Each structure stands twice: as C-alpha cells, then as structure tokens.
C-alpha cells in the first residue's frame, strides 16, 4: 500500500488530519459499501475515531469524504513528483509525469475512484466535480513550475482539464494491469495538443470542462456502481 499523505493544505482549506485518517481507512470499505455513511462509520472505527466525529468532519456525508479524497490524492501526486530522482524540465513531460503519478497512486483504489466519480457525475454535484477537477489541474501546473497569471493562467488549465479528464476515463476502462493502454492514450492526447502553454481556450472552458466531465462520468459509468 502506498504511503498516504495525512495532512495537506488545499485551496482555502486546512484539512484536519483526523478527517484524512478516516478517509484513508474508509477506502478499504468502499468496494463493499460504496461511498456511504456506513463506509465512513467503519473507516472511523478503523482509524480509532469516535463515531460522533464523523458528522462533524463530514457534514454532507460521503460527498465531503470524496472531496477530501481527491485533495489528498492531489497532495500525494505532488509529493511523489517532487520526490522523483530527476523531475522533467520540459513542461509537457512534467505534465505527463504528474498525470501518470496521479493515476498510478490511485491504481490500488480504482473501484473507490470509480464510485466517487459516479457520485460526482450526478447533477447535484456538478459544481463540486468542476471544482475538484480545477484543483487537480491547478496542482499539476504549479508542481510543473508554472506560476503564470492573467489569461494564460486559465487557458492552460482548461486545456489540461480536457486532457486529464479524458485520460481518467481511459484509465477507468484500462484492464491491462500495467496501465499500458492508459499511457498510450495519454501520449496520443498530448501529441494532439500542439503546445499546452499556447492553448487559447477562454476562461469559461474550465467550467465547461468540469461540467462536461461530470456528464461523461454519468454516461460512462452509469448506475452500475451507484449505492
């Protein structure tokens, strides 16, 4: 089992390490109970946390746990990237490495990710889905050393959101075991993007990418894994 990031700072939020411990423990129960109050209760028990703390830490229940899981995964991805013996210097290679790290680290919890995306794909959670997608691609750009501001700040993230969300769908369907199909898919997508830093999609592309991502999740995964 990969090392988990227990504490991180997400945009505008300092995440409680107790909440992180519950989410990490809950992952073992999601394949059986889905992202649910029951799974959270079991995770809290495994983490040695009193039951009453669950509702305090996750007032909206499972959807709050899903959001925290995504943010912890972002932190783990960034930490793993900076721990590489040699980080890629070219932007497209750094982005490639970050996307693959994000997915490789999630490989052991693939079913939990699938179920999380099923919930995020519901219309009621479209806004949160877009926010989490934005946070992930923003973390990727910043880890790659891109601190641009102004128009390019948004255009680059909109382009990366499209590449990452499409690759995530490919990863969910990849049963190769070694992610070979996912890697090939990502490389094709990156090749199709002539230059991510020169992308010209408007600001609204970030929001549109998130909403399109949510709809794609709902259509692709459907209700097969809804609990």
Predicted regions span which residues?
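N-terminal intrinsically disordered/low-complexity leader segments
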Residues: 1-16, 203, 210-211
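Short, amphipathic alpha-helix enriched in basic
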Residues: 8-52, 60-67, 71
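Hydrophobic alpha-helical connector segments
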Residues: 80-115
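Amphipathic alpha-helical segments used for helix-helix packing
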Residues: 105-127, 131
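Amphipathic alpha-helical packing segments from all-alpha helical-bundle domains
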Residues: 124-146, 154-161, 165
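Hydrophobic/aromatic-rich alpha-helical bundle segments in the mid-to-C-terminal region
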Residues: 146-208
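Long, charge-rich low-complexity segments
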Residues: 198-227
């Amino acid at each position: 089992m990969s090392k988990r990031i227990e504490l991180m700072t997400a945009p505008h939020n300092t995440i409680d390490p107790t909440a992180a411990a519950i989410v990490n423990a809950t992952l073992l129960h999601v394949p059986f109970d889905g992202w649910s109050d029951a799974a959270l209760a079991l995770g809290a028990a495994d983490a040695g946390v009193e039951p009453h703390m669950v509702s305090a830490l996750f007032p909206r229940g499972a959807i709050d746990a899903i959001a925290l899981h995504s943010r912890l995964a972002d932190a783990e991805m960034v930490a793993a990237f900076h721990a590489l013996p040699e980080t890629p210097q070219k932007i497209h290679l750094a982005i490639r490495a970050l996307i693959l790290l994000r997915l490789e680290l999630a490989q052991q919890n693939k079913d939990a990710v699938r179920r999380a995306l099923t919930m995020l794909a519901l219309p009621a959670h479209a806004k949160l889905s877009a926010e989490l997608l934005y946070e992930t691609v923003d973390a990727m750009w910043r880890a790659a050393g891109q601190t641009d501001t102004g128009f390019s700040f948004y255009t680059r993230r909109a382009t990366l959101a499209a590449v990452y969300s499409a690759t995530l769908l490919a990863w969910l369907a990849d049963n190769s075991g070694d992610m070979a199909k996912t890697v090939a898919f990502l490389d094709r997508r990156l090749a199709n993007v002539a230059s991510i830093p020169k992308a010209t999609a408007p600001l609204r592309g970030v929001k549109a990418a998130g909403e399109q991502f949510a709809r794609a999740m709902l259509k692709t995964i459907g209700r097969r894994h809804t609990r």
